[in-house]
Amino acid sequence: GKVWDWIKSTAKKLWNSEPVKELKNTALNAAKNFVAEKIGATPS
């Protein structure tokens, strides 16, 4: 119902908000660097 729609739209707004984008990018880069280190490659 309405509550679920509100939860979904709020979650979507949060997911696409700037602070969360920053966090996602930071986490992504950290993961990439971690994997690159493990396999002995340098991230491009």
Curated annotation (Swiss-Prot):
A Pfam family matched in the record: Antimicrobial_7
Record carries keyword Zinc: no
GO-annotated biological processes: defense response to bacterium; defense response to fungus; hemolysis in another organism; monoatomic ion transport
Localization per Swiss-Prot or TrEMBL: Secreted; Target cell membrane
Signal peptide (UniProt feature, chain positions): none
Tissue specificity annotation: Expressed by the venom gland.
Superkingdom to which the source organism belongs: Eukaryota
UniProt name for this protein: Opistoporin-2
Species: Opistophthalmus carinatus (African yellow leg scorpion)
